[in-house]
Amino acid sequence: MKTIVCYGDSNTYGYNPENGFRYEYEERWTTILQKELKDSAIVIPEGLNGRTTSFEDELRPGRNGATYLDPCLHSHGPIDLVVLMLGTNDLKIRFQATPTDIGKGIDRLIKMIKSITPQKRQDGQSAKILLM
């Protein structure tokens, strides 16, 4: 069985803007993906509202995606695929991030995935990465 980690922000979390809570479990895209894949893979949703690629948010601590990625990958290994859905929150005015800054944040996460995931796999290969 394959392991897929979906690492993202509120879209991965399943945030429902209509009520400020989460969509029901059955309505979240990660659950729908799991149902489509059936027993061929396990889908692990790792979403957090407001998560950034690598920016510290003084208004919402704990949202730096680079900080949590390391323990996340170690706790879920071995991982076959990481679906990376981050960058939208980097556009917040308070970060004053340029497209280059956001790209560097994504690049940092990709390098972390390529560095950490082979340590948890018997074949020593990096997990595949799907950047959304």
Task: Put a short name on every predicted segment.
Residues 1-48, 54-59, 72-76, 82:
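Serine-esterase "nucleophile elbow" of acetyl-processing enzymes
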Residues 11-12, 49, 89, 107:
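Catalytic metal-binding/acid-base residues of hydrolase active sites
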Residues 62-132:
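Alpha-helical cap/lid subdomain in secreted, periplasmic
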